[in-house]
């Protein structure tokens, strides 16, 4: 009987873990789709601006969409130990291989989180498996996601500078 209880608990734990993985994968797909849409809009605006510039023979300014180009040199958002590295990893209990598309850095709750580079905030809010999250588009197809925050310090559409406080660490 005790064995059945332990087995049932293990099965429930596995189901919970698999649900969390599915939620993170869905959130990741949501971020990817949002960034692709933003890149397509940026390309269309750039093409329209180039066409307008040709017809006006260089008079006036091209279109802008609150773009901030990052440097491409990412800084660390927080100072701490990497608790979960990028890439494939084996779940410590179930032995299943899962892909981790980022890194987790262990810090105390409330630690200020800094933008790794300049850019535009394209998401600031609750994002499923990432909890309270911020996504920054740095341009040239580069973006960063900062998840599991206790508090957010920036709004969607806001331009941010490298090193600017964007959130505070949590465990959401």
Residue ranges, per PLM feature:
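Catalytic cores of peptidoglycan-degrading enzymes
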Residues: 68-172
